[in-house]
Amino acid sequence: MTNQKKFKRQETQIWQHLQWEPSPQQLEQFNQLQYLLREWNQKINLTRLIEGNDFWISQILDSLWPIQDELKFQDKQINIIDVGTGCGLPGLAVAIALPRSSTTLIDSIYRKTSAVKEIVKELGLLSRVNVLTERIELTGQKKLHRHTFDLAIARAVAKAPVLAEYLIPFLKPTGQAVMYKGKWNDLEKKELLKALSKLKGKIDTTKSLELPERRGIRHAIRISSTMLCPGKYPRSVGIPLKRPLNNQTSDNL
Ligand SMILES: C[S@@+](CC[C@H](N)C(=O)[O-])C[C@H]1O[C@@H](n2cnc3c(N)ncnc32)[C@H](O)[C@@H]1O
């Protein structure tokens, strides 16, 4: 089998996993994203997962499987935020897959966000994808962004209690946050629940997927608010990480 045919078969497998298939324009945008990441990676170190199935499985499938629920409603206009976006993922893959959504991507590292801004421009997504260079703790306290998102997502940014403090304040009362996790166990769940009790949040669902090609197991933890998140969260820059909310004495500012 030629490499091209073999790859076509693997690509089809990815969409089968998602029970969703991109339109020709979306597929073109995913291909363009791969090309642009490759180009930018030569200038600054953005990600090592760019070629072949490193990109299609470990980036695209890994970004999209946790939002399978949203993929079923392509026409819904939703407001999404990706915190700690790094090279632009999972946010850019989600923005391409949900063409009526508006997405905000945040990272505090300027060299990453300036590359991601250029990528957004090249992909033709400027009208509905906004890139911010900022600490999540500051964005989460701004009226413009607080309680304004239907979906808040984060992959590989921090441990669950820290992530919950970053994500919950962004949610509308009906919104949900999705934490993309590699490993997940009862201890982590217990720690997350402790943090959520302070943030007035709850766990809605926990899903898992074994990525193809033995790329490991992934978990998606969906959380939401039970009532409005107390105004003191997220705490000042660096505090959520230094004193995570699962720790009894952590709540002193
Ligand atoms: C390991 S990278 C993950 C990037 C991307 N989400 C992915 O899955 O490939 C974590 C990113 O989160 C950003 N980050 C972590 N804590 C942050 C904070 N408090 N405010 C803004 N960005 C943060 C870092 O700058 C880094 O780019």
From Swiss-Prot:
It holds the Pfam family GidB. Its EC number is 2.1.1.-. S-adenosyl-L-methionine binds at residues 84, 89, 136-137, 155. GO terms for molecular function: rRNA (guanine-N7-)-methyltransferase activity. Its main location: cytoplasm. SUPFAM superfamilies: S-adenosyl-L-methionine-dependent methyltransferases. One of its GO terms (cellular component) is cytosol. It is found in: Cytoplasm. It is an enzyme of class 2 (transferase). The keyword Lyase does not apply. InterPro entries: rRNA_ssu_MeTfrase_G, SAM-dependent_MTases_sf. It comes from the Bacteria. Keywords: Cytoplasm, Methyltransferase, rRNA processing, S-adenosyl-L-methionine, Transferase. The keyword Cytoplasm applies. HAMAP family: 16SrRNA_methyltr_G. Specifically methylates the N7 position of a guanine in 16S rRNA. Belongs to the methyltransferase superfamily. RNA methyltransferase RsmG family. This is Ribosomal RNA small subunit methyltransferase G. It comes from Prochlorococcus marinus (strain SARG / CCMP1375 / SS120). The gene is rsmG.
